[in-house]
Amino acid sequence: TSTAYIVYSLVLAGTTAFDLGGPVNKAAGFVALGFTTEKILPITARTIAIVTPSIGLGLSTLIDRRLVGRKVYEDEFYELGKTSMFLAIMGISEGAIPFALERPSFTIPLYVVGSIIGAMSGVILGAEQWFPESAIWAWPLVKNLGVYILGILIGAVIIAVVNVYYRNNLIKKGKLVIDED
């Protein structure tokens, strides 16, 4: 794995996760698509970064009560979390947008960092995806699929755990109020 490919993957993952299907994401996609269709560079970092934030936020709604002993989201976010994970498996990152809209100054950088760490883990450990699709039906085309999934999980777990502890800290400080059932 060359240094240039590592830098490209890092930038690609960050720009892909930044706005979840928005213009920065689309610009990154056009560049990546050009490289992958010409067989210059694989699109692995992008396909991992597309699904990582949505899986991470969905996961956070499943583990919050086990991790910190309380809800850290309003009730509607628990359903949105399940939807977010389902959409991620379909290759759609926009399921994480409602979470980003609530606290964008924290959540968006978290998406970027978690996606970069997950994508770089997959890339450095040898996952390789040339087909420009992040949905589960394209996963059989991934070289080293186990490592690819590991990269997604690493990034998603980072996003989930950090977000749960961040929100729990806000609750403790009285900066976030969640109705307990």
Where would I find each of the regions flagged by the language model?
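Pore-lining transmembrane helices
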Residues: 1-178
